[in-house]
Amino acid sequence: MKIHEYQGKEILRKFGVAVPRGKPAFSVDEAVKVAEELGGPVWVVKAQIHAGGRGKGGGVKVAKSIEQVREYANQILGMQLVTHQTGPEGQKVNRLMIEEGADIKQELYVSLVVDRISQKIVLMGSSEGGMDIEEVAEKHPELIHKVIVEPSTGLLDAQADDLAAKIGVPAASIPQARAILQGLYKAFWETDASLAEINPLNVSGDGKVTALDAKFNFDSNALFRHPEIVAYRDLDEEDPAEIEASKFDLAYISLDGNIGCLVNGAGLAMATMDTIKLFGGEPANFLDVGGGATTEKVTEAFKLMLKNPDLKAILVNIFGGIMRCDVIAEGVIAGSKAVNLNVPLVVRMKGTNEDLGKKMLADSGLPIISADSMEEAAQKVVAAAAGK
C-alpha cells in the first residue's frame, strides 16, 4: 500500500524526523488559507499523487506570493499529471500539499528497503539526491552506499554517522543526520513498511538537515495490525479493478496487453505470463484466484477481465493441487454464461479431478479451446487473440 507525501511526513514527525511545516489542501481556497497560516515569504505547492517525478511533470511549484500560491494551486489541482511513473494517461491531482520554502544547499538521498537477496534490511544513501535513484544506480553505482541493519540492534550510531559522512553531510550536521536516519529506521520497522525513502534529504546553508520529501510503501499483509496506516489509504489513487478484485480475495494487477489470464498460484501466474510473451502475446492482467477459488470467485474474475476494452482472449491455466479442476470447470462454465463471454477462451487444467473437469467443459456446449500443456495453451491463446 502506498500513501501520499504529506501522510509520510506525518509519520516521520511522530518518529522525530525534522520536516518543513506544511499541510494538505483539497481546494484552491484551502491552499491559500494554509499558505497564510504558514507565513511567507516562500511556499511550495505540491501535487499529491502516488507517483514520483512530480516536479518534472509540472506538479511542484515554488510560490513567492499568496497570489502565486492561488495561481499554482489553480493550475495543479484537478490536472492530469503525467510523470515517468504514471504512464501516458497520467494521474488526476485531487489534493495538494502547501509547505514552507526551504534553503537548499545539498540534496541527498536516503532510504530503507528489504533486500531480498541478503534477506536483510538495508539503509541506502547517496550524495545524488533530488534525482531518480534508479538512474543514479545505473550510471553511477559507486555513488550509492549501503548499510545492513540488524533488527536486534537497530541502526547503530556508528552506522548512521558513517553513512552520513559518506554521502556528504558536513561534520557539524552529522548528529542531526543521525537522528533523522534512526527516526526513519524506527518508522520503517514499527509500521511494517517495505520502503521508507527521503528524497531529497536537505542540508541548508546554515547546516540544518530536513526531509523535503517522504515516500512510504507498506506490506499489505501486515496492514491488519496497523489501522492507523489503513486510514491513510486513498482509493482514488488505486486501480478500480484492483479494488474490486480485493473484495473477492482475488490478487489482480492490470497490465497493458490484450490476453486475460486466470491462474491459481502467483508462481504459475508469472510463468503463464512469461510463456504468453514467449510466443508473442501480451498479458492484460495478473490474476491469481488462489487455492480456495469458488464458482463466485471465478465468475467475478471473468467480470473483471471483461471490463478491459482491449481484451481479445482469455487463458485459464489451473494446476489442481488444493484447488480441484472440477470446481474450476464449474466456475468457468458459470462465469462464461453469466457474462455472455464473447472472446475466445483457452483452458488448460492439470491435477486433482482433471478428467472430470475436462469432461464438464466438453459437455458444457461452450466454445472452449482445450490445451494439455502450458506451451500449447499459450500458443493457442496468442493465435486466438490475433484472430487466427
UniProtKB/Swiss-Prot annotation:
Official protein name in the record: Succinate--CoA ligase [ADP-forming] subunit beta
Catalytic activity: succinate + ATP + CoA = succinyl-CoA + ADP + phosphate; GTP + succinate + CoA = succinyl-CoA + GDP + phosphate
Family classification: Belongs to the succinate/malate CoA ligase beta subunit family.
Pathway: Carbohydrate metabolism; tricarboxylic acid cycle; succinate from succinyl-CoA (ligase route): step 1/1
The protein's assembly and partners: Heterotetramer of two alpha and two beta subunits.
Database matches in Pfam families: ATP-grasp_2 (PF08442), Ligase_CoA (PF00549)
Binding site for Mg(2+): N199, D213
UniProt keyword Metal-binding present: yes
